[in-house]
């Protein structure tokens, strides 16, 4: 999924909104930072939704999912919000999405609700409790606990500072590499 916050930063000219968990690993700290910026600059949910509507899935994502679903059940476990994800999920064919919710009052984002602490690890644990083997891919610090919990974890287009700290996870740069890595673990 493309970075929603990067798109909003670009459209508003607010460089400060470009920060992601690659920059601020603590998601709660990052979201408080973002909400303060939104409030300070009076950026409302409709403004953000307008930018989200322009976003397209990452190049190759639709084709990757179409091929991957032939071999795996797919769940996207994301630190995004349902209020943001709809347009992109439609473009991806509505895969299962596990994410968070926003608190919105009069079109202003005033807060957010994290599904539970460490939701990515907990999601993988829940799939394990259901006796599923879990393969996971992520690109940032906030994905590491999910990769640790999964039967097999991969980095996908992770920045060097992240992948170097966790060399136990193969780094894939393309969807073809990721699919090949996943299929090799079947």
Predicted regions and their residues:
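Active-site neighborhood of HAD-like aspartate-dependent phosphohydrolases
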Residues: 1-36
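Metal-dependent phosphoesterase signature
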Residues: 30-60
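Conserved beta-strand/loop elements of the cytosolic catalytic core of P-type E1-E2 ATPases, chiefly
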Residues: 51-62, 77-79, 99-100, 112-118
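Substrate-recognition element of Asp-dependent hydrolases with the DxDx(T/V) motif
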Residues: 61-89, 96-100
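Substrate-recognition "cap/lid" segment bordering the active-site pocket of phosphatases
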Residues: 83-134
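Short acidic-hydrophobic, aromatic-tinged amphipathic segments that line or gate anion-handling sites
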Residues: 98, 169-178
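Short, charged, surface-exposed secondary-structure boundary motifs
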Residues: 105-112, 163-170, 181-185
């Amino acid at each position: 999924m493309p970075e929603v916050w990067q798109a909003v930063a670009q459209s508003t000219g607010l460089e400060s909104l470009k920060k992601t968990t690659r920059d601020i690993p603590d998601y709660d700290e990052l979201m408080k930072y973002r909400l303060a910026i939104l409030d300070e600059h009076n950026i409302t949910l409709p403004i953000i939704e307008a930018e989200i509507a322009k976003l397209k899935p990452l190049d190759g994502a639709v084709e990757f999912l179409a091929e991957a679903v032939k071999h795996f059940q797919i769940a996207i476990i994301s630190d995004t919000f349902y209020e943001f994800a709809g347009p992109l999920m439609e473009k991806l064919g509505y895969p299962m999405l596990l994410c968070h919710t926003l608190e919105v009052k009069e079109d202003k984002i005033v807060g957010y609700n994290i599904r539970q602490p460490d939701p990515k690890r907990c999601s993988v644990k829940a799939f394990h409790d259901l006796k599923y083997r879990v393969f996971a891919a992520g690109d940032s610090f906030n994905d590491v606990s999910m990769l640790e919990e999964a039967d097999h974890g991969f980095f996908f287009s992770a920045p060097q500072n992240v992948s170097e700290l966790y060399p136990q996870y193969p780094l894939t740069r393309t969807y073809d590499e990721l699919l090949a890595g996943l299929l090799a673990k079947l």
